[in-house]
């Protein structure tokens, strides 16, 4: 991991009504200094309304989520906050089936996401329909292990993107799960794909050593187990933000990469009930 961007031990899965977090003792003295805040969510699945809990309380919802994001941007400075979605923002409620997935794009735009990756359910209505929807999206879409260049869809998807936040140059690579078992073969068989480990190593090396990024993030939709395997087969990745398995991680998990370095992995459950928050100094 590049030492100029150390992942601070302040990892929280956050209920919208309040933010909880802690600074590890080793770096507690740095908590008052401005730095990069990463907010991440995954597998929202067209859930726009709060979930009713057994005790009668409400959890999640896009209005509450947007309010939480805005509160963090006000507190930390919008220029210091990176907001990402790890895929499957589509499918899972009548909003998607009745409105053809347009509302999901409107919500992503209104909330001001900086970058998203694709999940398998983004393809439920086909390649051409996904292209139509993404043409209205205001942020980069990253996916490195599929080749969409022969489709209209290819205009809206790149293997990686580079952003500047909190004075740091940040490279974000997208990795999508094997679609052959989760998407109709009439769709999947039209899309060439690459080995996920090879393309991750290729672009991570490029972002680290050619673009001189301070931080290299893999934004994935391959599941928690897939994230661990990805880390163990790659290098030059500083952080993995995952989705697909709906795994609720209330703390960072770590896996060693090819160089024997611990790489943190995070994921924030599903349905927009929680956001993850990461502080980088």
List where the protein language model places each region.
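Acidic, metal/ion-coordinating pockets
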Residues: 24-281
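Hydrophobic alpha-helical membrane-insertion segments, chiefly the h-region
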Residues: 14-25
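N-terminal Sec-pathway targeting helices
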Residues: 1-13
């Amino acid at each position: 991991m590049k030492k100029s961007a150390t992942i601070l031990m302040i990892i929280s899965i956050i209920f919208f009504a309040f933010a909880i977090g802690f600074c590890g003792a080793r770096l507690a003295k740095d908590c008052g200094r401005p730095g990069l805040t990463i907010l991440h969510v995954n597998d929202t699945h067209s859930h726009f309304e709060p979930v009713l809990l057994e005790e009668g309380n409400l959890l999640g919802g896009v209005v509450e989520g947007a309010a939480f994001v805005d509160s963090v941007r006000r507190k930390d400075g919008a220029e210091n906050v990176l907001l990402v979605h790890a895929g499957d923002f589509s499918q899972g409620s009548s909003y998607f089936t009745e409105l053809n997935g347009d509302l999901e794009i409107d919500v992503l735009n209104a909330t001001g996401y900086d970058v998203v990756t694709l999940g398998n359910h983004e393809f439920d209505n086909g390649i051409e329909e996904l292209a139509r929807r993404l043409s209205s999206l205001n942020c980069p879409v990253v996916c490195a292990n599929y080749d969409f260049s022969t489709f209209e869809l290819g205009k809206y998807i790149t293997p990686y993107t580079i952003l500047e936040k909190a004075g740091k140059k940040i490279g974000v690579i997208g990795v999508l799960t094997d679609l052959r078992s989760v998407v109709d073969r009439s769709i999947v068989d039209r899309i060439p794909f690459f080995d996920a480990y090879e393309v991750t190593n290729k672009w991570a090396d490029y972002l680290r050593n050619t673009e001189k990024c301070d931080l290299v993030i893999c934004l994935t939709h391959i599941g928690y187990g897939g994230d661990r395997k990805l880390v163990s087969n790659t290098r030059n990745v500083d952080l993995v933000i995952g989705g697909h398995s709906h795994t609720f991680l209330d703390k960072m998990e770590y896996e060693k990469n090819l160089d024997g370095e611990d790489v943190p992995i995070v994921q924030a459950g599903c349905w927009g009930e929680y956001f993850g928050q990461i502080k980088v100094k």
